[in-house]
From Swiss-Prot:
Keywords: Ribonucleoprotein, Ribosomal protein, RNA-binding, rRNA-binding. Belongs to the bacterial ribosomal protein bS6 family. This is Small ribosomal subunit protein bS6. PROSITE patterns: RIBOSOMAL_S6. The gene is rpsF. Pfam families: Ribosomal_S6 (PF01250). It comes from Bacillus velezensis (strain DSM 23117 / BGSC 10A6 / LMG 26770 / FZB42) (Bacillus amyloliquefaciens subsp. plantarum). The keyword Signal does not apply. The keyword rRNA-binding applies. Binds together with bS18 to 16S ribosomal RNA. InterPro entries: Ribosomal_bS6, Ribosomal_bS6_CS, Ribosomal_bS6_sf, Ribosomal_S6_plastid/chlpt, Transl_elong_EF1B/ribsomal_bS6.
Length: 95
């Protein structure tokens, strides 16, 4: 299993309940595909460096994950489709 850091930005005009549902749904995508979430950080609402989809800020979420590539690929696929996530990145950590 490899270690990954996943960062995604949730659109800012979402209510608190829906935000929690999005976080839970994407955590479940990883865990149901065999990933182990070793750490999570909620950076809260931050200003973006540039406008994305007419949004100037967003809710940052960072996950440290230990998994196979398939779980991360599924997260990546679903994050691209989701309207709630305006930007995401997955980085493989050095051993």
């Amino acid at each position: 299993m490899k270690k990954y850091e996943v960062m995604y930005i949730i659109r800012p005009n979402i209510d608190e309940e829906s935000k929690k549902a999005v976080i839970e749904r994407f955590n479940n995508v990883l865990t149901s595909n065999g990933a182990e979430i070793t750490g999570t950080k909620d950076w809260g609402k931050r200003r973006l460096a540039y406008e994305i989809n007419d949004f100037r800020d967003g809710f940052y979420q960072i996950l440290n994950v230990q998994s196979e590539a398939a779980a991360v690929a599924e997260f990546d696929r679903l994050a691209k489709i989701s309207d709630d996530i305006i930007r995401h990145i997955v980085v493989k950590e050095e051993e």
